[in-house]
Protein backbone atom coordinates (compact mmCIF):
# COMPACT_ATOMS: atom_id res chain seq x y z
CA UNK A 1 0.00 0.00 0.00
CA UNK A 2 1.75 3.25 -1.15
CA UNK A 3 -0.25 5.32 1.33
CA UNK A 4 0.90 3.20 4.26
CA UNK A 5 4.50 3.41 3.07
CA UNK A 6 4.33 7.21 2.96
CA UNK A 7 2.76 7.26 6.44
CA UNK A 8 5.49 4.97 7.82
CA UNK A 9 8.21 7.12 6.27
CA UNK A 10 6.61 10.24 7.73
CA UNK A 11 6.61 8.65 11.18
CA UNK A 12 10.26 7.72 10.66
CA UNK A 13 11.15 11.34 9.84
CA UNK A 14 9.12 12.71 12.76
CA UNK A 15 10.92 10.33 15.12
CA UNK A 16 14.24 11.79 13.97
CA UNK A 17 13.16 15.38 14.73
CA UNK A 18 14.96 16.54 17.89
CA UNK A 19 11.89 17.66 19.85
CA UNK A 20 12.53 17.44 23.62
CA UNK A 21 10.23 15.35 25.76
CA UNK A 22 7.97 16.98 28.33
CA UNK A 23 9.45 16.30 31.76
CA UNK A 24 7.19 18.39 33.95
CA UNK A 25 3.59 18.02 35.08
CA UNK A 26 0.33 19.19 33.46
CA UNK A 27 -1.63 21.78 35.44
CA UNK A 28 -5.06 23.36 35.27
CA UNK A 29 -5.62 27.02 34.46
CA UNK A 30 -7.03 27.52 37.95
CA UNK A 31 -3.74 26.41 39.52
CA UNK A 32 -1.98 29.57 38.31
CA UNK A 33 -2.10 32.73 40.41
CA UNK A 34 -4.85 35.05 39.10
CA UNK A 35 -2.50 38.04 39.27
CA UNK A 36 -0.62 36.90 36.17
CA UNK A 37 -1.39 38.42 32.78
CA UNK A 38 -2.68 36.10 30.02
CA UNK A 39 0.69 35.81 28.26
CA UNK A 40 2.38 35.02 31.58
CA UNK A 41 -0.18 32.35 32.40
CA UNK A 42 0.33 30.68 29.02
CA UNK A 43 4.11 30.64 29.42
CA UNK A 44 3.95 29.32 33.00
CA UNK A 45 1.62 26.48 31.96
CA UNK A 46 3.97 25.60 29.07
CA UNK A 47 7.08 25.76 31.28
CA UNK A 48 5.60 23.65 34.09
CA UNK A 49 4.46 21.03 31.59
CA UNK A 50 7.86 20.97 29.89
CA UNK A 51 9.93 20.86 33.07
CA UNK A 52 13.04 22.20 31.30
CA UNK A 53 12.34 25.35 29.36
CA UNK A 54 13.78 28.77 28.47
CA UNK A 55 11.91 32.06 28.75
CA UNK A 56 13.44 34.75 26.56
CA UNK A 57 11.25 37.78 27.24
CA UNK A 58 11.90 41.48 26.78
CA UNK A 59 12.19 43.82 29.75
CA UNK A 60 8.90 44.46 31.54
CA UNK A 61 7.10 41.27 30.50
CA UNK A 62 7.38 39.68 33.95
CA UNK A 63 10.24 37.18 33.86
CA UNK A 64 10.62 37.16 37.65
CA UNK A 65 6.89 36.57 38.22
CA UNK A 66 6.84 33.75 35.67
CA UNK A 67 9.90 32.09 37.19
CA UNK A 68 8.53 32.22 40.73
CA UNK A 69 5.13 30.86 39.74
CA UNK A 70 6.72 28.13 37.61
CA UNK A 71 8.93 27.02 40.50
CA UNK A 72 5.99 27.09 42.92
CA UNK A 73 3.91 24.84 40.67
CA UNK A 74 6.62 22.42 39.58
CA UNK A 75 8.27 21.86 42.99
CA UNK A 76 6.72 19.31 45.39
CA UNK A 77 5.70 20.76 48.77
CA UNK A 78 8.41 18.78 50.54
CA UNK A 79 11.20 19.85 48.16
CA UNK A 80 13.31 22.94 47.46
CA UNK A 81 13.65 25.24 44.45
CA UNK A 82 16.43 27.73 43.74
CA UNK A 83 16.53 31.01 41.84
CA UNK A 84 20.04 32.09 40.82
CA UNK A 85 20.29 35.74 39.84
CA UNK A 86 22.65 38.73 39.88
CA UNK A 87 22.79 40.24 43.36
CA UNK A 88 21.17 43.48 42.21
CA UNK A 89 18.02 41.67 41.05
CA UNK A 90 17.29 40.04 44.42
CA UNK A 91 15.00 42.85 45.64
CA UNK A 92 12.81 42.50 42.55
CA UNK A 93 12.26 38.81 43.26
CA UNK A 94 11.47 39.47 46.93
CA UNK A 95 8.92 42.10 45.89
CA UNK A 96 7.25 39.86 43.30
CA UNK A 97 7.22 36.90 45.69
CA UNK A 98 5.24 38.99 48.17
CA UNK A 99 2.70 39.83 45.47
CA UNK A 100 2.30 36.12 44.73
CA UNK A 101 2.14 35.13 48.39
CA UNK A 102 5.34 33.10 48.08
CA UNK A 103 7.93 32.88 50.84
CA UNK A 104 11.43 33.23 49.42
CA UNK A 105 14.69 33.08 51.37
CA UNK A 106 18.03 34.54 50.34
CA UNK A 107 21.01 32.28 51.06
CA UNK A 108 24.73 32.39 50.35
CA UNK A 109 25.88 29.14 51.99
CA UNK A 110 24.59 25.62 52.44
CA UNK A 111 24.25 25.97 56.22
CA UNK A 112 21.66 28.72 55.69
CA UNK A 113 19.24 26.31 54.00
CA UNK A 114 16.45 25.12 56.28
CA UNK A 115 13.54 23.00 55.10
CA UNK A 116 11.55 22.97 51.86
CA UNK A 117 10.59 26.10 49.93
CA UNK A 118 11.95 28.53 47.36
CA UNK A 119 15.41 29.99 47.89
CA UNK A 120 17.34 32.66 46.02
CA UNK A 121 21.09 33.17 45.70
CA UNK A 122 23.63 34.93 43.51
CA UNK A 123 25.78 33.38 40.77
CA UNK A 124 29.03 33.85 42.67
CA UNK A 125 27.87 31.70 45.61
CA UNK A 126 27.18 28.81 43.25
CA UNK A 127 30.32 29.38 41.18
CA UNK A 128 32.53 29.40 44.28
CA UNK A 129 31.01 26.20 45.67
CA UNK A 130 29.44 27.79 48.75
CA UNK A 131 26.03 26.26 48.03
CA UNK A 132 25.23 22.56 47.64
CA UNK A 133 22.87 22.67 44.66
CA UNK A 134 22.11 18.94 44.92
CA UNK A 135 19.66 19.89 47.69
CA UNK A 136 17.30 21.46 45.15
CA UNK A 137 14.74 19.75 42.94
CA UNK A 138 14.25 22.75 40.63
CA UNK A 139 16.43 25.67 39.55
CA UNK A 140 15.91 28.79 37.47
CA UNK A 141 18.75 30.92 36.13
CA UNK A 142 17.64 34.55 35.96
CA UNK A 143 19.53 36.90 33.65
CA UNK A 144 21.21 33.73 32.42
CA UNK A 145 23.19 35.72 29.87
CA UNK A 146 25.56 36.79 32.69
CA UNK A 147 27.14 33.34 32.41
CA UNK A 148 28.88 34.68 29.30
CA UNK A 149 30.78 37.21 31.40
CA UNK A 150 32.05 34.46 33.71
CA UNK A 151 33.70 32.59 30.84
CA UNK A 152 33.42 29.08 29.48
CA UNK A 153 34.90 27.45 32.60
CA UNK A 154 32.02 28.68 34.77
CA UNK A 155 29.49 27.65 32.15
CA UNK A 156 30.90 24.11 32.06
CA UNK A 157 30.83 23.94 35.86
CA UNK A 158 27.15 24.96 35.86
CA UNK A 159 26.40 22.18 33.37
CA UNK A 160 27.97 19.64 35.68
CA UNK A 161 26.46 21.04 38.89
CA UNK A 162 22.88 20.84 37.65
CA UNK A 163 23.20 17.74 35.51
CA UNK A 164 20.95 15.76 37.85
CA UNK A 165 18.52 18.55 38.81
CA UNK A 166 15.05 17.38 37.83
CA UNK A 167 13.55 20.71 36.73
CA UNK A 168 15.66 23.40 35.05
CA UNK A 169 14.74 26.79 33.63
CA UNK A 170 16.57 29.79 32.22
CA UNK A 171 15.23 33.31 31.79
CA UNK A 172 16.83 36.32 30.19
CA UNK A 173 16.08 39.09 27.74
CA UNK A 174 15.65 37.96 24.15
CA UNK A 175 19.07 36.83 22.85
CA UNK A 176 20.22 37.99 19.44
CA UNK A 177 19.13 35.39 16.87
CA UNK A 178 22.71 35.05 15.62
CA UNK A 179 24.10 34.23 19.08
CA UNK A 180 24.03 30.56 18.20
CA UNK A 181 26.63 29.55 20.78
CA UNK A 182 24.64 31.16 23.58
CA UNK A 183 21.42 29.46 22.48
CA UNK A 184 22.92 25.98 22.32
CA UNK A 185 24.62 26.55 25.68
CA UNK A 186 21.17 27.07 27.17
CA UNK A 187 20.03 23.85 25.51
CA UNK A 188 22.99 22.08 27.07
CA UNK A 189 22.18 23.41 30.54
CA UNK A 190 18.54 22.38 30.22
CA UNK A 191 19.54 18.91 29.08
CA UNK A 192 17.67 19.35 25.81
CA UNK A 193 20.69 18.49 23.66
CA UNK A 194 24.39 18.14 24.27
CA UNK A 195 26.28 21.24 23.13
CA UNK A 196 28.67 19.25 20.96
CA UNK A 197 25.82 17.32 19.37
CA UNK A 198 23.98 20.56 18.56
CA UNK A 199 27.10 22.04 16.98
CA UNK A 200 27.62 18.99 14.80
CA UNK A 201 23.98 18.63 13.84
CA UNK A 202 23.15 22.21 12.85
CA UNK A 203 26.32 24.16 12.09
CA UNK A 204 29.15 24.30 9.63
CA UNK A 205 32.42 25.62 10.99
CA UNK A 206 34.49 28.41 9.56
CA UNK A 207 38.08 27.16 9.33
CA UNK A 208 39.33 30.73 8.92
CA UNK A 209 37.67 32.18 12.02
CA UNK A 210 37.16 30.57 15.42
CA UNK A 211 33.63 30.44 16.88
CA UNK A 212 32.11 31.70 13.63
CA UNK A 213 29.11 29.40 13.26
CA UNK A 214 26.87 29.23 10.21
CA UNK A 215 23.69 27.19 9.99
CA UNK A 216 23.65 24.50 7.34
CA UNK A 217 21.14 25.80 4.76
CA UNK A 218 19.22 22.51 4.78
CA UNK A 219 19.06 22.58 8.61
CA UNK A 220 17.70 26.11 9.15
CA UNK A 221 14.02 25.17 9.37
CA UNK A 222 14.80 22.22 11.65
CA UNK A 223 16.97 24.38 13.92
CA UNK A 224 14.32 27.05 14.49
CA UNK A 225 11.63 24.40 14.96
CA UNK A 226 13.82 22.65 17.52
CA UNK A 227 14.53 25.96 19.29
CA UNK A 228 10.85 26.83 19.51
CA UNK A 229 10.12 23.46 21.12
CA UNK A 230 11.98 24.37 24.32
CA UNK A 231 12.28 28.19 24.27
CA UNK A 232 9.79 31.03 23.99
CA UNK A 233 10.87 34.36 22.48
CA UNK A 234 8.73 37.32 23.42
CA UNK A 235 8.97 41.03 22.64
CA UNK A 236 5.34 41.79 23.52
CA UNK A 237 2.21 39.85 24.55
CA UNK A 238 0.97 40.26 20.97
CA UNK A 239 3.67 37.81 19.85
CA UNK A 240 1.56 35.08 21.46
CA UNK A 241 -1.73 36.54 20.27
CA UNK A 242 -2.62 38.33 23.51
CA UNK A 243 -3.65 41.98 23.94
CA UNK A 244 -0.92 44.55 24.42
CA UNK A 245 -2.93 46.42 27.05
CA UNK A 246 -0.56 48.13 29.45
CA UNK A 247 2.47 47.41 27.28
CA UNK A 248 2.00 49.93 24.49
CA UNK A 249 4.23 52.96 24.90
CA UNK A 250 2.94 56.40 23.89
CA UNK A 251 4.25 57.98 20.72
CA UNK A 252 7.72 59.39 21.15
CA UNK A 253 7.73 63.17 21.38
CA UNK A 254 10.95 64.81 20.20
CA UNK A 255 11.66 68.45 21.00
CA UNK A 256 14.73 70.18 19.61
CA UNK A 257 16.56 72.86 21.56
CA UNK A 258 19.23 74.86 19.79
CA UNK A 259 22.10 76.19 21.89
CA UNK A 260 24.07 79.04 20.37
CA UNK A 261 27.78 79.11 21.01
CA UNK A 262 30.75 81.20 19.98
CA UNK A 263 32.65 79.27 17.25
CA UNK A 264 35.88 80.98 18.25
CA UNK A 265 35.81 79.03 21.55
CA UNK A 266 36.87 75.90 19.74
CA UNK A 267 39.93 77.52 18.19
CA UNK A 268 42.25 76.53 21.00
CA UNK A 269 45.16 74.23 21.57
CA UNK A 270 45.25 71.35 23.98
CA UNK A 271 48.12 70.71 26.38
CA UNK A 272 50.05 68.87 23.66
CA UNK A 273 49.83 71.79 21.27
CA UNK A 274 47.25 70.15 19.02
CA UNK A 275 44.68 72.54 17.57
CA UNK A 276 40.98 71.80 18.03
CA UNK A 277 38.43 72.25 15.27
CA UNK A 278 35.44 71.78 17.57
CA UNK A 279 34.58 71.95 21.26
CA UNK A 280 35.56 68.64 22.81
CA UNK A 281 33.33 66.64 25.13
CA UNK A 282 33.55 67.76 28.76
CA UNK A 283 34.27 64.81 31.02
CA UNK A 284 35.54 66.40 34.22
CA UNK A 285 33.59 68.46 36.76
CA UNK A 286 35.62 71.60 36.07
CA UNK A 287 35.34 71.42 32.27
CA UNK A 288 31.64 70.56 32.46
CA UNK A 289 31.00 73.60 34.66
CA UNK A 290 32.89 75.82 32.21
CA UNK A 291 30.85 74.46 29.31
CA UNK A 292 27.58 75.14 31.10
CA UNK A 293 28.72 78.65 31.93
CA UNK A 294 29.72 79.43 28.35
CA UNK A 295 26.56 78.03 26.77
CA UNK A 296 23.92 79.39 29.13
Regions found by a protein language model. Give the residues of each.
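Conserved helix-turn-beta segment of the N-terminal RecA-like "Helicase ATP-binding" lobe
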Residues: 88-111, 190-194
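Conserved helix/coil segment N-terminal to the catalytic DExD/H
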Residues: 110-138, 149, 153
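Conserved Walker A/P-loop ATP-binding site and its immediately adjacent core
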Residues: 64-69, 78-100, 177-183
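Conserved P-loop NTPase motor "coupling/switch" region that bridges the ATPase
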Residues: 76-80, 99, 138, 146, ...
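Conserved helicase/translocase motor-coupling segment
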Residues: 239-296
Amino acid sequence: DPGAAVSDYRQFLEAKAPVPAEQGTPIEAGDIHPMLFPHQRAIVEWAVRGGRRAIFAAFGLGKSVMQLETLRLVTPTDARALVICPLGVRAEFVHDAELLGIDITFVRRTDEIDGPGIYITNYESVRDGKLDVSLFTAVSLDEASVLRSFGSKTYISFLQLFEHTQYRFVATATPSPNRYKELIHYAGFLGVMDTGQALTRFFQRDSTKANNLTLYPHKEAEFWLWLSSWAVFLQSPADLGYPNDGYQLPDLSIEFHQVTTDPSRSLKEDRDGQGRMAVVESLGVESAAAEKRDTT
